[in-house]
């Protein structure tokens, strides 16, 4: 069965073959029961994740694939839904941030109709790491295509209400307050892949990749 691991292993193939593999992989992902889909993370090595990012870039060559999304909340076109929870793994966490290699995220809709999220870490040093979700079409630094961006900002989300059990926002510590963003590509149902950048608040600051690429798989059975 071709799943993301097989897709990543085909990076030496021509781009038209990449696209065929992306289409087939998406169909295979649909065949995996939702409650078992998060197990994909355990089947992948960190080296596979950058290849998945690269290969999902071919999705934009197909008009139909380019419109497909990984989840309802990330479609940015819903009215009211409960939060979604995702399991995430990076290709390489920077030192001294190796604890960021595996984490969880939550996506939720605010009363204002916008979409937001937070990174959920085991470490309590960094508190609640909230972000805003926006639709974008390309990465600023590379001009590569993408679907969304997670913008961390200063962390002080001005919302009148948060999902039950969510902590009160707090000011982000460095480097999360240094215009940290994660660009997102839809990879398949319940699966997205991201690329994190520290773009910097200073105009003359050169953007740099933060923690490589990040594979994110929706967890259909977990909550906080």
Q: What does each model-found stretch correspond to?
A:
Residues 1-224:
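Soluble ligand-binding/transfer domains with enclosed cavities or grooves
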């Amino acid at each position: 069965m071709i799943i993301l691991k097989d897709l990543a292993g085909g990076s030496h193939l021509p781009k038209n073959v990449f696209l065929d593999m992306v289409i087939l992989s998406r169909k295979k992902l649909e065949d995996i029961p939702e409650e078992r889909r998060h197990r994909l993370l355990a089947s992948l090595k960190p080296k596979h994740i950058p290849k998945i990012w690269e290969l999902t870039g071919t999705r934009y060559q197909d008009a139909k694939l380019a419109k497909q999304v990984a989840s309802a909340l990330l479609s940015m076109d819903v009215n009211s839904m409960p939060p979604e929870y995702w399991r995430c793994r990076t290709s390489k966490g920077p030192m001294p941030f190796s604890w960021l290699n595996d984490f969880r995220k939550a996506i939720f809709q605010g009363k204002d109709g916008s979409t937001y999220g937070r990174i959920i870490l085991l470490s309590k040093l960094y508190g609640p790491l909230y972000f805003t979700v926006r639709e974008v079409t390309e990465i600023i630094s590379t001009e590569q295509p993408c679907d969304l961006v997670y913008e961390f900002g200063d962390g002080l989300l001005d919302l009148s209400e948060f999902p039950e059990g969510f902590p009160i926002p707090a000011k982000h510590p460095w480097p999360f307050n240094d215009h940290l963003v994660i660009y997102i590509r839809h990879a398949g149902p319940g699966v997205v892949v991201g690329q994190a950048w520290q773009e910097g608040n200073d105009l003359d600051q050169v953007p740099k990749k933060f923690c490589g690429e990040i594979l994110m798989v929706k967890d259909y059975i977990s909550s906080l």
